[in-house]
């Protein structure tokens, strides 16, 4: 199974890249946001891509889909859990940043989701129904995805707990519409349930786990 490739760009098209890795050329399908990112890296010696490998009985020819970061790939894998959204459809639909799509899901913005390529209103409603409460952690991780030299860490490093608290409260207030007092209460309750939390992603997941359980 192929999970990551580093190589030299031989050719870049509107929705795919031909990547030379150890004298083998890999044709890799790219979401629109990744194409834009690759265009800015053509002068780099190597391109790094996290790979989703797709092959089924109905799709016997392997398809490789590339992402700038592990977080983008994680979001993609969450996205394709929605009924009627397969890997190829999901790749075409990811024409905005992960944080933008995740924010629309958490805000139940069906109108915006319906504008994504290949996603109509009915599918947008399915996305919200299936993923609301699950996409919030990508609001926190997406700002770091693809930063710097394009090589993302395989996991998010632990941050001092106060920084994690501040970051989660900011997302709850600024992006999801909670009042500051309500956001702080939600975070405090999450930490009561799991005092060992040290990362903003884990804290956000626990906040919404409590919200769903309630």
Swiss-Prot record:
Annotated segments matching region Flexible linker: 147-160
Domain of life: Bacteria
Residue numbers spanned by region Domain I: 1-68
Protein location: Cytoplasm
Region Domain II: start-end pairs: 69-146
An example Gene Ontology biological process: DNA recombination
Location of the region described as Domain III in the Swiss-Prot/TrEMBL record: 161-214
Keyword check for DNA repair: yes
Assigned keywords, A-Z: Cytoplasm, DNA damage, DNA recombination, DNA repair, DNA-binding
MF-aspect GO terms: ATP binding; four-way junction DNA binding; four-way junction helicase activity
Recorded GO CC terms: cytoplasm; Holliday junction resolvase complex
Subunit relationships: Homotetramer. Forms an RuvA(8)-RuvB(12)-Holliday junction (HJ) complex. HJ DNA is sandwiched between 2 RuvA tetramers; dsDNA enters through RuvA and exits via RuvB. An RuvB hexamer assembles on each DNA strand where it exits the tetramer. Each RuvB hexamer is contacted by two RuvA subunits (via domain III) on 2 adjacent RuvB subunits; this complex drives branch migration. In the full resolvosome a probable DNA-RuvA(4)-RuvB(12)-RuvC(2) complex forms which resolves the HJ.
NCBIfam families the record matches: ruvA (TIGR00084)
Family named by the database record: Belongs to the RuvA family.
Swiss-Prot/TrEMBL domain comment: Has three domains with a flexible linker between the domains II and III and assumes an 'L' shape. Domain III is highly mobile and contacts RuvB.
Role noted for this protein: The RuvA-RuvB-RuvC complex processes Holliday junction (HJ) DNA during genetic recombination and DNA repair, while the RuvA-RuvB complex plays an important role in the rescue of blocked DNA replication forks via replication fork reversal (RFR). RuvA specifically binds to HJ cruciform DNA, conferring on it an open structure. The RuvB hexamer acts as an ATP-dependent pump, pulling dsDNA into and through the RuvAB complex. HJ branch migration allows RuvC to scan DNA until it finds its consensus sequence, where it cleaves and resolves the cruciform DNA.
Protein name: Holliday junction branch migration complex subunit RuvA
Organism, as annotated: Desulforapulum autotrophicum (strain ATCC 43914 / DSM 3382 / VKM B-1955 / HRM2) (Desulfobacterium autotrophicum)
Annotated gene: ruvA
């Amino acid at each position: 199974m192929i999970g990551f490739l580093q190589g030299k760009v031989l050719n870049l098209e509107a929705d795919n890249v031909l990547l030379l890795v150890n004298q083998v050329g890999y044709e890799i399908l790219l979401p629109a946001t990744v194409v834009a990112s690759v265009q800015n890296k053509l002068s780099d010696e190597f391109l790094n891509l996290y790979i989703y490998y797709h092959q089924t009985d109905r799709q016997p020819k392997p398809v490789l889909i590339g992402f700038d970061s592990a977080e983008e790939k994680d979001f993609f894998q969450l996205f394709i859990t929605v009924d009627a959204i397969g890997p190829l459809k999901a790749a075409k639909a990811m024409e905005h940043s992960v944080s933008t799509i995740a924010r629309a899901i958490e805000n139940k913005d069906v109108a915006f989701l319906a504008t994504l390529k290949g996603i109509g209103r009915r599918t947008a409603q399915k996305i919200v129904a299936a993923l609301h409460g699950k996409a919030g952690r990508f609001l926190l991780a997406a700002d770091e995805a693809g930063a710097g030299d394009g090589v993302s860490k395989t996991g998010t490093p632990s941050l001092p707990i106060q920084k994690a608290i501040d970051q989660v409260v900011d997302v709850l207030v600024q992006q999801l519409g909670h009042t500051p007092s309500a956001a702080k209460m939600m975070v405090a309750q999450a930490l009561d349930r799991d005092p060992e939390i040290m990362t903003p992603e884990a804290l956000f997941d626990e906040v919404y786990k409590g919200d769903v359980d309630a």
